[in-house]
């Protein structure tokens, strides 16, 4: 049935698996995507949205690298918002509300159009491991499929257990079976496994809601998009979300179910996402709060199904229903399905290399929730990198490892490998020390050349990026070289409450003032003439504005990143014996021996490794 040897097999077709399969196949290697249901590719198991704070930057990075998530998010969006627009550009984060059904449909269409990619529907029961190397997979029907590399992207399916009140049953997602056998094979091979928990809110009938009792949340008046390619366009129409609140009455009703809650009666021992707690966890931990926000999110253009964001719960279904009916606008709500919690297996990510290949089994890669992360975007980015590196390994090429100053994806993977996680990890801008460098607007500058060099990002993408870079640099040079007269600039400065000038000055200096924005600069004739003559579009104008106004911050971060790069250049031998260094702390020896960092820089970020330990290590490496 499967006589030929595949180059790469991807197990699981969620966000991680879909990106992994696409990347591997697009790099020209023979790839097989195995999933329990071909009808459920790239499902949005939780909220119908992509992007958000730090997550939007990741989607842009995936797109810049040649992944599919940005394009598909644009094609299936029903609303666009640029979050944190009142803050500096390092914090701006794009987010779209998505059409859940169209999102999954578009993913399947794009995957089916991808060359070198085959599909097979069946549950994977086990792994074929020989002499410390992956050799393939074994399905529930006993079919063996051989491959040079395997990427596991099992999501919440590994020994998944669903909880609704006092009821519990096996499942990887509502209405779908859990996956059994893989965890057991991995543990037998020497891997450490753990358990995590996540949850999801009820889905309700939008026709039963009174939106007049809620606050309308509209999209941006000038919506942007995720993808840097010209394959997609910004939305021409948008669908509103709404916001309402819980109340003390709602909280009292929810407490009635605490004695039947798996969270409070001890049946759920696993740790859930810190930054996405269940509604029962919120009212228990923040008992002094009189209300909590609920975002009412439509599931698409052509469906009445609504997602109640902020009401994730595993309380009994009767309590869920009773409590929601006490929320303003939900007095006559009809349920499509109740919320639930799910426990699943994961594998502490310190067992991986920065390529996402496992240290124990050569050719085996992990991506997504199996690594302890939460979120579509985090999963998709890991899948992309695992797919890239699995394909590069098969082709006997150097791996692609993104550094912390190159991408949020680099921060994410480095955090997982060097620090590990014992709770579902999600990305925040605060996790990135170089966030002024890692903005959502410049992911193409940072990553497209690297991706093009390995054969993933297209020539067309590269040319578009180079054109954008050239035009924005020319615009910045124009501001540096062009002066503005006292007569022209002082009225603008006076209007903005900024200090007046006594002699003409360079536009760059004027533009650098915090009170002066792009709209002010466009009042000057010289700027208007330049823009008209060079046909400068909004994207270039905004890029130039960021480069001018934040040049000092950007330069400072670049210098700091360059210092870090020097430590990245100091390699540690793969089987280095840390125990022979007498002046290093015992904890550092244990942590370094377990995690096996590749560079001094990675070693310095491991919890329990002090600056003095790093200094000793540097001396030992002859630096």
What residue spans do the PLM features occupy?
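Short hydrophobic core segments
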Residues: 11, 144-155
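Beta1/beta-strand and adjacent pyrophosphate-binding region of the FAD-binding site
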Residues: 2-16
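Extended, charge-enriched "interface" segments that sit outside catalytic cores
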Residues: 431, 437, 448-615, 619-622
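Conserved beta-strand-loop-beta-strand element in the redox core of flavoprotein oxidoreductases
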Residues: 128-144
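Internal hydrophobic alpha-helix adjacent to the cofactor/substrate pocket in enzyme cavities
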Residues: 379-400
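A glycine-rich dinucleotide-binding beta-alpha-beta segment and adjacent secondary-structure elements
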Residues: 307-373, 401-414, 537-591, 596
């Amino acid at each position: 049935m499967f006589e030929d040897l595949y180059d790469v097999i991807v197990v699981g077709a969620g966000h991680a698996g879909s990106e992994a399969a696409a990347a591997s196949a697009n790099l020209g290697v023979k790839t097989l995507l195995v999933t329990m249901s071909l009808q459920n590719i790239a499902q949005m198991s939780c909220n119908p949205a992509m992007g958000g704070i730090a997550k939007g930057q990741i989607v842009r990075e995936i797109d810049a690298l040649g992944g599919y998530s940005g394009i598909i998010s644009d094609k299936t969006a029903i609303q666009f918002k640029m979050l944190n627009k009142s803050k500096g550009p390092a914090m701006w984060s794009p987010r779209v509300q998505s059409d859940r059904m169209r999102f999954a449909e578009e993913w399947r269409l794009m995957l089916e159009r991808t060359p070198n990619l085959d599909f097979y529907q069946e549950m994977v029961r086990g792994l074929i491991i020989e002499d410390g190397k992956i050799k393939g997979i074994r399905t529930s029907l006993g079919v063996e499929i051989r491959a040079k590399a395997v990427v596991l992207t099992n999501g919440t399916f590994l020994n998944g257990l669903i909880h609704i009140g006092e009821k519990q049953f096996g499942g990887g997602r509502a209405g779908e079976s859990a996956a059994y056998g893989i965890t057991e094979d991995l543990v037998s091979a020497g891997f450490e496994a753990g358990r995590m928990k996540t949850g999801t809110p009820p889905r309700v009938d939008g026709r039963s809601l009174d939106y007049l009792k809620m606050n309308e949340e509209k999209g941006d008046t000038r919506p942007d998009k995720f993808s840097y390619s010209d394959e997609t366009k910004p939305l021409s129409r948008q669908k509103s979300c709404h916001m309402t609140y819980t109340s003390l009455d709602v909280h009292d009703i929810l407490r009635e179910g605490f004695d039947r809650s798996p969270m409070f009666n001890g049946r759920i021992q696993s740790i859930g996402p810190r930054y996405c707690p269940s509604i029962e966890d919120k009212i228990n931990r923040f008992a002094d709060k009189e209300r909590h926000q609920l975002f009412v999110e439509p599931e698409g253009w052509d469906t009445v199904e609504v997602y109640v964001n902020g009401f994730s719960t595993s309380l009994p279904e009767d309590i869920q229903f009773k409590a929601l009916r006490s929320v303003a606008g939900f007095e006559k709500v009809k349920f499509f399905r109740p919320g639930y919690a799910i426990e699943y297996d994961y594998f502490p990510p310190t067992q991986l290399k920065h390529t996402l290949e496992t240290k124990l089994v050569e050719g085996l890669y992990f991506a997504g929730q199996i690594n302890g992360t939460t979120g579509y975007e985090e999963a998709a980015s890991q899948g992309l990198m695992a797919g890239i590196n699995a394909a590069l390994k098969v082709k006997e090429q150097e791996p692609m490892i993104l550094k912390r100053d190159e991408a949020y994806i680099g921060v994410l993977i480095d955090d997982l490998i060097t620090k590990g996680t014992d709770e579902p990890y999600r990305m925040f801008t605060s996790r990135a020390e170089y966030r002024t460098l890692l903005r959502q607007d410049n992911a193409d500058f940072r990553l497209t050349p690297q991706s093009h060099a390995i054969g993933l990002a297209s020539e067309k993408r590269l040319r578009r990026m180079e054109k954008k870079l050239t035009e924005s640099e020319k615009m910045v040079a124009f501001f540096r070289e062009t002066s503005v007269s006292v007569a022209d600039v002082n009225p603008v400065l006076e209007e903005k409450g900024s200090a007046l000038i006594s002699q003409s000055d360079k536009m760059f200096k004027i533009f650098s003032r915090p009170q002066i924005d792009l709209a002010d600069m466009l009042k000057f004739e010289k700027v208007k003439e330049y823009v008209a003559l060079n046909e400068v579009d909004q994207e270039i104008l905004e890029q130039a504005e960021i480069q001018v106004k934040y040049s000092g911050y950007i330069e400072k971060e670049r210098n700091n990143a360059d210092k870090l790069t020097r430590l990245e250049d100091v390699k540690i031998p793969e089987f280095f014996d840390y125990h022979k260094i007498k002046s290093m702390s015992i904890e550092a020896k244990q942590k370094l021996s377990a995690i096996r960092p590749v560079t001094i820089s990675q070693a310095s970020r491991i919890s329990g490794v002090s600056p003095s330990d790093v200094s000793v290590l540097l001396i030992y490496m002859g630096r």
